[in-house]
Amino acid sequence: MARLKLRKLEEYLQGVDGFEQPKILLEQYPTPPHIAACMAHHMQSQHEDIEGKLVGDLGCGCGMLSIASTLLGAQLTVGFELDGDAVDTFRGNVVEMELPNVDCVRADVLQLIGSKWEKSFDTVLMNPPFGTKHNAGMDMRFLEVALRLANRAVYSLHKTSTRSYIQKKALEWGARGSVVAELRYNIDASYKFHKQKSKDIEVDFWRFEIGTE
């Protein structure tokens, strides 16, 4: 499983069940299988940050990124998710796909600083809330937590418009950030306030290297 090709990985991820009723306050947008596959494949093929590693997934939702890292050979993947419904779906996906070494902890990501999980992971990956509706700055709070939990690297998605700010804050937090790719992130009309069937937003895929103050 550890040497899955990108296309095959995406095929597997298309079988992952998503949110039944997305919750607007938690900004629950699923990570599309194509983007999740590209993220995980890059992490492993370019940096060897998954296979045999301890991987954390913050705000893991129904498990798309956690499952991607497990399929690429993570030694153990632990997802953290506040929403109980999403946790149930995550665990259902894991059972249905018969995946070992992956679990989901129901927890508030923002409460993980100072917990037993600090510096517990080689790699942390996440698709955080962008903080565009009710949670201003939430993605940066997630990033701060991620940098406390990881020993090696953090991978994350952030709106392109915040790039220079993210670069600056990462340095303040003892990490060097680099933009791996610029993406057009398609958000389906999950909520009533979406007038269009789907819309694209410009998003950066970041890699943060720990301990480069």
UniProtKB/Swiss-Prot annotation:
Sorted UniProt keywords: Cytoplasm, Methyltransferase, S-adenosyl-L-methionine, Transferase
Matches recorded under InterPro entries: DNA_methylase_N6_adenine_CS (IPR002052), rRNA_MeTrfase/Polyamine_Synth (IPR051720), SAM-dependent_MTases_sf (IPR029063), Small_mtfrase_dom (IPR007848)
Protein name as catalogued: rRNA N(6)-adenosine-methyltransferase Mettl5
One GO BP: rRNA methylation
UniProt-listed Enzyme Commission number(s): 2.1.1.-
UniProt superkingdom: Eukaryota
Subcellular location: Cytoplasm
Role summary: Catalytic subunit of a heterodimer with Trmt112, which specifically methylates the 6th position of adenine in 18S rRNA.
Binding site for S-adenosyl-L-methionine: Q28, T31, G59, C62, D108, V109
Keyword Transferase carried by entry: yes
Main subcellular location of this protein, as a coarse class: cytoplasm
Family, per entry: Belongs to the methyltransferase superfamily. PrmA family.
Record-level Gene Ontology MF annotations: nucleic acid binding; rRNA (adenine-N6-)-methyltransferase activity
Gene Ontology CC terms: cytoplasm
Expression across tissues: Enriched in the brain.
Phenotype caused by lack of the gene: Flies are viable and fertile and do not display obvious developmental defects. They however show impaired orientation in walking behavioral assays.
Record field: catalytic activity: adenosine in rRNA + S-adenosyl-L-methionine = N(6)-methyladenosine in rRNA + S-adenosyl-L-homocysteine + H(+)
Enzyme class: transferase
Subunit structure: Heterodimer; heterodimerizes with Trmt112.
A Pfam family per the record: MTS
